[in-house]
């Protein structure tokens, strides 16, 4: 019997538990001992070691960590790494762990620390008693033992055994990790040469090193070879079409500067770069002199960027102010590039998480879809499931259902959902306030000054089912079919000797992305630590920028590690000032560097074009607008028009906004302003999926276009949100940041509106002072806090922009296209929000529209989603006629009461 069993038996006897129960883990222990026999040669002499292991597993020092960190937080930045190192010291009490804690704290703060003071704080910490640990274990043991749950008893014992076993493996050789995984390695890699290279690498590093470092080195080589095999398959054209490398230039990787003749991006190796920055500006646009050709080239470049960017890494896209015939294209490009980037890959999805029948069923609700017999929600789902799985034919399905669609339309519609549309994952839209520059602003040139640029951040998550080693033990004995994000697969370690098994002996859960983030945090190099000043500057998603290098510094520090290879495309300034200082390898692809650049001799016949078809005939966008709904009959309602023309300056129509607007005459309203219901973000706004949300919004937007006067404006306030689009999967794996602003612009323009500008509503400092970085100060953890909403200024075409005669004296603080003001909550003496509405917006917004973009006292200003009547009341106060449309009876009553508080009576028409 080895020292590990002896230690475990001694612990059980101390708790008066029959030590013979260790036989439950005999078989598992034997397997471990065969793989790593040397673990049995290093006995742990601390007789209390099992109690310390359990103290760690049960997180019993959590309160001590909290108390100490709060005390030290006055002097030091106390991140997640420092807390983890502190907990390890408190759990085990080893001097080496105390030194690790000091070093971690010093690294996170980038300064020397007062060790004597910190030790005095630690001295006041009350250690977790042996009795408390014992009672915790006995409680769990007895609960399982009383109902004969031998599986749990085995897990409890194996959890202790595996931790002791891993302690016997304080030092490892790489070949030991390889040997323990050899059979699985041969299943993961395709080529004998790859397996041979991995084994030779492990044999060439025969030195016994700390287990953590050995596992990290093994994993890094393993991931390098995974990339190498993938690149080989890309050149051999064995991958999906969008990932294959059609042209090869064996010399191109030797040069840091590359002159792109127009399509040389096709020569760059697949998944070669750990970060890609793509900059589009006026000079870039001028090479084309045609908006569609320019857009096609940019879209095609984004498609290639997806190919060349390493998986789970970041793509940053900077959009400058670009002019075509005096029209600023900046915010017009934003929706096209964002929507395309997220959805340009059309593919048939066979993964179990995608339920085409469920998504289609939601949209068919618009067509009175039902079964002719035994109709129920579940049976509708089942019949569609049978169709999508090929069990019934089109004719059979159509004979069993009622649906308000022609047969050919029905199946064209259904068959769209055999495909999903992937791409990058939208992460953020950062608004850059360029205090060093000012830009022209089209029709708003003299009204609102323009000082903004856009920086979009995307992640790439390409589905990759190949196993990756556990970061804690290096094992490939893993399983898992869950996804933190779509296409970002996570694994659970099944190795019984993994040191990071949980309280219930579950294995460590990890993904490729979490691995490189955690290793960067655990083994940070000096250039990987992000300075406190940089985090403070980029804390919010509206950032004052003085020069281009500030942008490079953030991108390099936030989204790359030391020695990684970064690709910059079409930069105005060289990023080498930052990249050389931060020890990154940089490649620049540009048409501006002819004199120093490498020009390939490989002739590329393919052209970067054809991607604009995504917007003309792509299936993805059809799902929002081409639903084959019956054409609505528009009938002008005398009742509504009499109501609009009657006396009174504050009016409210209770009814569905779309139905009301269909009944209004053309060219009725002088302006519109609203904050619509955000997709599933409030209790009053719930849609099954994003398709149906924007289908409803689009129909209302079209009616607003028809009923507005030519030259009038529509100010539309909306924010990007975190939610599930429910167009691929309905579980939490589908949760992501949804660029509602991008879709809003797209559908307004499709309805006929012209976008004049996006005025940024700066909502000030977020209520939380917490930086979203999980307490870590290394790459990929930083997340700026959302501090703004969009206020899009759309104009109905057909006439010059309508401006009031005295707009200059009435525009107030609306001088430039970033306007700061706080959200409004009117609180009474009882601390209650008397506006009642969960998302009220300031009267400054509709007042700005009334004062600047309308001319006459009898002008009607429309709010199609009235809420608590803010827009109509502000219009009334500006001596205009304010009209709200509101579906909810509760909000109609709230609006009436609110107006009375303002001393105004509301004229209300019920149009339900």
From Swiss-Prot:
Matching Gene3D superfamilies: Vaccinia Virus protein VP39
EC main group: transferase
Record-linked InterPro entries: DNA_methylase_N4/N6 (IPR002941), MeTrfase_CN4_CS (IPR017985), RM_Methyltransferase (IPR001091), SAM-dependent_MTases_sf (IPR029063)
Domain of life: Bacteria
Catalytic activity, EC: 2.1.1.113
Reaction equations catalysed: a 2'-deoxycytidine in DNA + S-adenosyl-L-methionine = an N(4)-methyl-2'-deoxycytidine in DNA + S-adenosyl-L-homocysteine + H(+)
Disulfide bonds: none
Annotated GO MF terms: DNA binding; N-methyltransferase activity; site-specific DNA-methyltransferase (cytosine-N4-specific) activity
Record keyword GTP-binding present: no
A biological process from GO: methylation
Keywords linked to the UniProt accession: DNA-binding, Methyltransferase, Restriction system, S-adenosyl-L-methionine, Transferase
Function, as annotated: A beta subtype methylase.
Membership in a protein family: Belongs to the N(4)/N(6)-methyltransferase family. N(4) subfamily.
Protein name: Type II beta methyltransferase M.BslI
Taxonomic lineage of the native organism: Bacteria, Bacillati, Bacillota, Bacilli, Bacillales
